Amino acid sequence: MKINISELTVKPIDISYIPTLLEIQEETFRHAGGSGDFLRRNTYETLAPCFEEPSVVLGVFYKEQMIAFGILYAAGQTKENLAYDIDEVTDVRENANLKLSIVRPDYRGNGIQQLLIVRLEQSARESGFKWISVTVSPDNPWSLNNCKACGYTEVKRLEKYGGLVRVLLAKKI
């Protein structure tokens, strides 16, 4: 569905939206044919910590319906922090993960993922982060291209999340 990006509302959302995030995630899995390699399946428990500051979760709304969301996750010194795999990052606490960015299938192709990336970068800068990193399936050229269009560079390919091959990208902000 073609929409005008100026008709969208992007705003921080709270933990009460997790059921909607999971619904959008499952819609994406169904659209992708159920491939578990394309996207890591998250649960309520894996998403809940993303709502703790300084992490940020943004929802994108069109006519009052959430059509997309993005998560900037401050993983700190936990094993979730992608900075451990990036040699240039000397202090992992300076990195935030772009954990998830999902657009409902009917609304793809409108620049929404790039809009989310830019807004999440802004939040990261305001919180004092120096780096943002993200992993993307090599079978997801759309997200790879969107990240690269936003200035992210490929660091390496590696196995994450129980053996899934991912492209690690990073950007100094």
Each language-model region and where it sits:
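Conserved GNAT acetyl-CoA-binding A-motif
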Residues: 124-136
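Active-site rim helix/loop that mediates acceptor-substrate recognition in acyltransferases
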Residues: 35-63, 71
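Conserved active-site alpha-helix within GNAT-family acetyltransferase domains
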Residues: 114, 126, 138-156
